[in-house]
Regions:
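C-terminal ends of transmembrane helices
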Residues: 1-3, 38-41, 108-111, 187-202
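Structural signature of hydrophobic alpha-helical transmembrane segments
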Residues: 21-22, 26-29, 90-99, 173-184, ...
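Juxtamembrane and boundary regions of transmembrane helices in multi-pass small-molecule transporters
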Residues: 65-66, 75, 84-129, 303-365
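Long, contiguous bundles of hydrophobic transmembrane helices that form the permeation core
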Residues: 101-163
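Small-residue-rich segments of transmembrane alpha-helices in multi-pass membrane proteins
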Residues: 12-19, 55-63, 123-130, 207-221, ...
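Transmembrane helical segments that form the transport core of multi-pass membrane transport proteins
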Residues: 143-274
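Membrane-interfacial helix-loop connectors
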Residues: 21, 31-46, 50-52, 58, ...
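Alpha-helical transmembrane segments and their helix-start/interface "positive-inside/aromatic belt" motifs
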Residues: 10, 53, 131-143, 201-215, ...
């Protein structure tokens, strides 16, 4: 079928994707919905803002409620953070951020849709209307459930067995998880009709483009992460002192911004671990006495991954898919103009609402 990208339809798709991101991961939700969203808006002239807000909400902020949502939270889960801890502790942060962004998006999209009169005539719509909307390839929901199951398995099952692979210890449960994920992907490829992928404009080109970029990013950020891990004894000692008071007590709002800003331009998963350990690394203490600090670290690493294309892998994947469909997306700094103008004021508001008054000494921002 063919959805028509009105403000209500677009906002509904973004809202659904935001919810799905914590269930099937930001990458899964983004890849599931980006092509239908692009097709729904293929008869509109102004649609870059639609993809930008899609990155904000579906590829980032929506994944903040469970370890399935985003890699930083999954690493926390592997460290022993309870599965529903993030949902319990940053639920309000996520809802406030999502509702505000959806409202801002609806206002911007309504302006373009109603005042700019930029919708093309229906006869020029590249996607023709059909009698009904529906799903093809529904068997893939089974393989998706299997993939989620393997991810959860690696966090819940502690085999106690490790293998040394090229000098890196790899736990048995992680090997089982990775083999399971590859198997689910293979079954999906084999059981899905080629016509479904053709009709969905599926291509490996965006995946390869993102893979090349992130291999380079992971190699180049390794020294930076190592310097951060050195803590007070490394070149970032000033940052360590910045996020604690004179008595060594964590300052939540500073953890939120330090974790977030670095996550926006480095890989957010190792950045989360750096600040997790910087805050003490004691799961029992971080999930109770220092719960507000861990909430700040969790929210910062997930939310601020939206600040740049390289803050989170789905960001660049969405950009690549959009460009592959023919949409001219903003440059790296062009996207940052959008993200900083919209997200920084939002994050300042979240700081005041959720992090400024949690600090033990009641320091006011």
């Amino acid at each position: 079928g063919n959805l028509h990208g009105s403000p209500k339809v677009n906002t509904a798709i973004l809202a659904i994707g935001t919810v799905l991101a914590s269930i099937m991961g930001t990458t899964g939700a983004a890849m599931l919905l980006i092509r239908p969203l692009l097709r729904a808006n293929d008869n509109r002239k102004h649609k870059v803002h639609v993809v930008v807000f899609f990155i904000f909400l579906v590829a980032n902020i929506g994944g903040s409620l469970t370890p399935l949502g985003d890699p930083p939270l999954f690493l926390g889960f592997l460290k022993g953070v309870p599965f529903f801890w993030t949902m319990t502790n940053i639920w309000y942060d996520t809802v406030v951020a999502a509702v505000i962004l959806l409202a801002v998006f609806y206002a911007i999209d309504s302006y373009y849709y109603h005042r700019r009169e930029e919708e093309m005539p229906s006869t020029m719509d590249p996607t023709p209307d059909t009698s009904k909307l529906g799903f093809d390839g529904t068997l893939n929901f089974v393989w998706l459930a299997g993939a989620i199951g393997f991810v959860l398995l690696s966090g819940l099952w502690k085999s106690g067995v490790e293998f040394n692979i090229l000098g890196t210890p790899v736990a048995l449960q992680n090997i089982v998880r990775d083999v399971g994920l590859i198997t689910m992907a293979y079954l999906s490829w084999q059981t899905t009709a080629k016509s479904v992928r053709v009709e969905n404009d599926f291509s490996f080109a965006p995946v390869f483009e993102v893979a090349k970029l992130f291999v380079a990013i992971f190699i180049t950020i390794a020294p930076v992460i190592a310097m951060l891990q050195a803590g007070a004894n490394g070149p970032f000692a000033g940052l360590v002192s910045l996020v604690h008071d004179a008595n060594g007590v964590p300052i939540d709002e500073r953890y939120f911004w330090a974790t977030g800003m670095l996550s926006g331009f480095l890989d957010n998963a190792p950045t989360y671990l750096v600040f997790f350990n910087l805050a003490g690394g004691d799961v029992a203490r971080l999930t109770t006495e220092l719960a507000s600090t861990l909430a700040a670290i969790s929210a910062g690493s997930v939310f601020m991954g939206a600040l740049s294309y390289i803050g989170n892998a789905p960001n660049f994947m969405v950009k690549a898919v959009a460009e592959h469909s023919g949409l001219k997306m903003p440059s790296f700094f062009g996207y940052m103009a959008w993200s900083f103008c919209i997200l920084i004021p939002l994050f300042l508001l979240l700081t005041v609402l959720f992090f400024c008054f949690t600090y033990n000494s009641l320091i006011v921002c």
